[in-house]
UniProtKB/Swiss-Prot annotation:
Protein name per Swiss-Prot or TrEMBL: NADH-ubiquinone oxidoreductase chain 3
Membrane topology: Multi-pass membrane protein
Enzyme Commission number(s) from the entry: 7.1.1.2
Predominant location category: mitochondrion
Annotated S-S bridges: none
Pfam families linked to this entry: Oxidored_q4 (PF00507)
Database matches in InterPro entries: NADH_UbQ/plastoQ_OxRdtase_su3, NDAH_ubi_oxred_su3_sf
Amino acid sequence: MNLSLTFMTDVILALLLVMIAFWLPQLNIYTEKYSSYECGFDPMGSARLPFSMKFFLVAITFLLFDLEIALLLPLPWASQTTNLKLMLTMALLLISILAAGLAYEWSQKGLEWEE
């Protein structure tokens, strides 16, 4: 009874918040708010610098591989488990997925900085 009451309260509250969001007026977007502010002077140039898409892709690839390496860090402690065969199988599976991802990035020229 208590769980169903909590669930119903959550659903009703979520629906109420969604309905209120639809009824609220849209805010006006002012162009002055999106321009750069330089101490009261007119901006000398665009504040939005062009961003290298190649750098972004290399950074995302680094983050993904770094996360996968972080998943391998507990392996020395996991080797003390009773089911060593399963642990080694899962570790080799993770390493092979990591190697396959690296090979794919390399074959797609995702690691080369040339443009």
